[in-house]
Amino acid sequence: MSKIFVNPSAIRAGLADLEMAEETVDLINRNVEDNQAHLQGEPIEVEALPEDMRRLHISEQKHSQLSDSACGKEEGSDDDFYMADSEDPYVPMQSYLDNVGIQIVKKMKTGERFFKIWSQAVEEIISYVTVNFPLPSGKSTDDKSTQTVSERSRQNPQPSSVKKEDQLSKTKVVSQEASGPPALEWSATNDEDDASVEAEIAHQIAESFSKKYKFPSRSSGIFLYNFEQLKTNLDDIVREAKRIPGVMRLAQDGLRLPLRCILGWVASTHSKRFQILVDSDKLSKIMQDDINRYLAY
């Protein structure tokens, strides 16, 4: 007979596995017993209940009526909170914006410049909003969050307002001296901001976005510069252009804007490379001459 030798370590490993299996079975049984502990107690008999509990009667009809009334209240509250699609004014506006987006994509496929397309779309959207969402005449447009002044400060607002105006005038002078060309005259004041005026400024700037302009360099030479080299957002350019005297008035009248002057001003405040290359004295003279020439027409 052939002898079969079994390694003692394999026997020990098998015994350990059997012990682990037995422990696992015991653990499962204990968990089952713990989970079913509430079923092992004595059942509650109805006869042992107090007398008050016998008087309770459950009516399914009343419960259904209560649930129906609760659902009705919830539906009513939802109807009060949400408007129908026919009454919601933002539904046609959403469809209008979708159509505008489709038109923009079509124009971009034809090869038109994006800034020209976008300026036209902005004007159309502004006109749509002003026509379909007019401001109520009887209500004030002031922000309620800022109207937290006490009654005493409302009765005597003159000293604080005078101080604020003085501080604003001082800060304007300091900022103009620090950032603007030194020889540019800032005596003229811009008119009130208007969305149509901003759209006109943005439209003219976008039309000439890549047009080359000439500026005198520090070496008395001439170098070219345009709005694209600024790498600045169009909204920021328009915001800076409104600070130039006379630009708002020209835009309100629909006249041509001094784009070289606008570019020189924005570049002198936002582009360090432009500040290094350009001669500030010659630049300020060019900007002042452009403003005077355009305002004279």
Curated annotation (Swiss-Prot):
CDD domains: RABV_P-protein-C_like. GO terms for molecular function: RNA-directed RNA polymerase activity. Keywords: Chaperone, Host cytoplasm, Host nucleus, Host-virus interaction, Inhibition of host innate immune response by virus, Inhibition of host interferon signaling pathway by virus, Inhibition of host STAT1 by virus, Inhibition of host STAT2 by virus, Interferon antiviral system evasion, Phosphoprotein, Viral immunoevasion, Viral RNA replication, Virion. One of its GO terms (biological process) is symbiont-mediated suppression of host JAK-STAT cascade via inhibition of STAT1 activity. The keyword Chaperone applies. GO terms for cellular component: host cell cytoplasm; host cell nucleus; virion component. Residues 137-191 are annotated as: Disordered. It comes from the Viruses. Phosphorylated by host PKC and by an unknown kinase. InterPro entries: PP_M1-like, PP_M1_C, RABV_P-like_C. It holds the Pfam family PP_M1. A motif (Nuclear export signal) lies at residues 49-58. Residues 146-161 have a biased composition (Polar residues). A motif (Nuclear localization signal) lies at residues 211-214. The modification Phosphoserine is found at S64, S210, S271. Homotrimer when phosphorylated. This trimer is stabilized by binding to the L protein. Binds soluble protein N, and ribonucleocapsid. Interacts with host STAT1, STAT2 and PML. Non catalytic polymerase cofactor and regulatory protein that plays a role in viral transcription and replication. Stabilizes the RNA polymerase L to the N-RNA template and binds the soluble protein N, preventing it from encapsidating non-genomic RNA. Also inhibits host IFN-alpha and IFN-beta signaling by binding and retaining phosphorylated STAT1 in the cytoplasm or by inhibiting the DNA binding of STAT1 in the nucleus. Belongs to the lyssavirus protein P family. This is Phosphoprotein.
